[in-house]
């Protein structure tokens, strides 16, 4: 179990000591998606979902979730986040909304869990906003696509293109 930093020598969970690590600029990008009926996506894009403006609510939910990550994931360190962006990319051909969260900090540990949590909760908010019209939505493909900063350097998931067109960026 030597590769698992969250376990002590007895295999018990612990919060990793990061106090001796150098503070560096860190960034993580995560993505996920919500698949839905084509009619549901049309309602979202037309601003006709009965509960209100879906992307605005989901964006705020994702931002709030990133800030609450240490309250949800037991061994995460509370961090001073310096930036959180949550964006959406509708994909009518596949009847889905793609979600991207970018989280930044200058600190002693990374923000991967914060980015993943932001995407997941933004997806849950989309589900909540649209469940009255589509209970068959599927949340999925939540993944880390980029990580930079710290001793381990840069991670880039192969096959992930940069987003050029996004919805709700105003």
From Swiss-Prot:
A GO molecular-function annotation: cyclic pyranopterin monophosphate synthase activity
E.C. designation(s): 4.6.1.17
Name this protein carries in UniProt: Cyclic pyranopterin monophosphate synthase
Described function: Catalyzes the conversion of (8S)-3',8-cyclo-7,8-dihydroguanosine 5'-triphosphate to cyclic pyranopterin monophosphate (cPMP).
Chain residues that bind substrate: 75-77, 113-114
UniProt pathway annotation: Cofactor biosynthesis; molybdopterin biosynthesis
Lineage: Bacteria, Bacillati, Bacillota, Clostridia, Eubacteriales
Keywords: Lyase, Molybdenum cofactor biosynthesis
Source organism, top-level taxon: Bacteria
EC top class named in words: lyase
Residues annotated as catalytic: 128
Reaction catalysis annotation: (8S)-3',8-cyclo-7,8-dihydroguanosine 5'-triphosphate = cyclic pyranopterin phosphate + diphosphate
InterPro entries linked: MoaC (IPR023045), MoaC_bact/euk (IPR047594), MoaC_sf (IPR036522), MoCo_biosynth_MoaA/MoaC (IPR050105), Mopterin_CF_biosynth-C_dom (IPR002820)
């Amino acid at each position: 179990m030597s590769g698992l930093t969250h376990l002590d020598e007895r295999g018990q969970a612990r919060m990793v000591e990061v106090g001796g690590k150098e503070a560096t600029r860190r960034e993580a990008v995560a993505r996920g998606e919500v698949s839905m009926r084509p009619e549901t996506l049309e309602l979202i894009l037309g601003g006709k979902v009965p509960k209100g403006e879906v992307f605005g609510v989901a964006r705020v939910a994702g931002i709030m979730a990133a800030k609450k990550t240490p309250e949800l994931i037991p061994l995460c360190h509370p961090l001073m986040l310096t930036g959180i962006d949550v964006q959406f990319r509708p994909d009518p051909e596949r009847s889905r909304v793609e979600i991207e969260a970018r989280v930044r900090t200058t600190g002693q540990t990374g923000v991967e869990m914060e980015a993943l949590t932001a995407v997941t909760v933004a997806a849950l908010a989309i589900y909540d906003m649209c469940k009255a019209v589509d209970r068959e939505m599927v949340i999925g493909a939540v993944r880390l696509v980029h990580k930079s900063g710290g001793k381990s350097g840069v991670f880039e998931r192969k096959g992930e293109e940069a987003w050029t067109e996004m919805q709700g960026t105003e």
